[in-house]
A protein has these predicted regions:
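ATP-binding pocket architecture of kinase catalytic cores
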Residues: 27-99
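A glycine-centered beta->alpha junction motif in the catalytic cores
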Residues: 61-78, 89, 111-122, 223-247
Length: 278
């Protein structure tokens, strides 16, 4: 398999010492990623936001794609986080199936449970990880239970982010965009403390979310994507990961309070099941 370093050398005459998706070379910022389902739509997306975004660099053969990879260059632009969130709530003429969301979440919980079982058997793991695993497994199961309250079989889609972070490089990253339920970015923004509960309610009203979308919003707030991603994809024995897990453990009470506040607000729009142990 050809490495990213070899692709950069062979097709762009860029020479780096180590692989990195984001990098600088001769005073310019670059990003290298594989072609994805959103590649063709990306220019229209950033144009709609009034930004230049990431721009394609043609290779030495004057072609945009090099062995299924695309190289972009970019400059940090002034932006407002709210414009990304507002755009994510614009409905597309596409729908996502609720059943597929449920199946995906069940698969994530099952895989994480398996990995957590392996980690928990290691003496080197500290007790915080065990507490977190029980807590987040419970949240995940509660989220799926709430998901079952949705009556429609499909939800309206929007242009969302895999990781919703208030950072230009992540918000405009061509590989960080996905067609998903238009609720995804809204839920992530609240969970990541990027918006307050008052702002969350304003977006609900402005976007005229349906009852089913509000139910799904609550289930997304409950589902512990960040912890499950760590449990599945990362080595939880790693010192940096342990530090992240410890921070999660220390923040559990704040997270519970945030979920209760959101539940109280959302419950004004539709009756939502209360999680007794929150």
């Amino acid at each position: 398999m050809v490495s990213e370093l070899e692709i950069l050398q062979r097709f762009y005459q860029i020479y780096l010492e180590q692989e990195s998706d984001f990098f600088s070379f001769q005073g310019n910022f670059y990003y290298l990623c594989k072609v994805n389902n959103f590649t063709n739509d990306y220019p229209y997306y950033v144009n709609a936001l009034g930004l230049n975004g990431f721009m394609v660099v043609n290779n030495c053969f004057n072609r945009p794609i090099s062995m299924d990879y695309i190289l972009y260059t970019y400059q940090i632009e002034d932006y407002h986080f709210e414009m990304f969130l507002q755009y994510s709530l614009r409905p597309l003429d596409i729908q996502v199936e609720v059943l597929k969301i449920k199946e995906s979440w069940c698969a994530i919980l099952d895989e994480a449970k398996c990995k957590i079982g392996n980690y928990a058997s290691r003496i080197s793991h500290f007790e915080h990880f065990v507490v977190l695993s029980y807590y987040y497994q419970g949240l995940g199961e509660a989220a799926i239970s709430v998901l079952n309250e949705i009556k429609e079989t499909k939800l309206v889609a929007g242009i969302e982010h895999f990781n919703m972070i208030d950072n230009y490089e992540m918000l405009c990253c061509p590989a960080n965009l996905v067609i998903a339920s238009r609720i995804k970015d809204l839920a992530s923004s609240y969970k990541n403390n990027l918006i307050s509960v008052e702002q969350l309610e304003q977006y609900i009203q402005i976007s005229a979310l349906t009852v089913d979308e509000i139910i799904y919003l609550y289930s997304r707030l409950l589902f512990p994507s960040e912890f499950m991603q760590l449990a599945i994809n990362d080595d939880c024995n790693d010192a940096q990961i342990k530090k992240t897990l410890l921070n999660m453990y220390q923040n559990i009470d704040n997270q519970k309070a945030s979920l209760v506040i959101a539940w109280q607000m959302l419950n004004k729009y539709t009756r939502l099941p209360k999680i007794a142990w929150l």
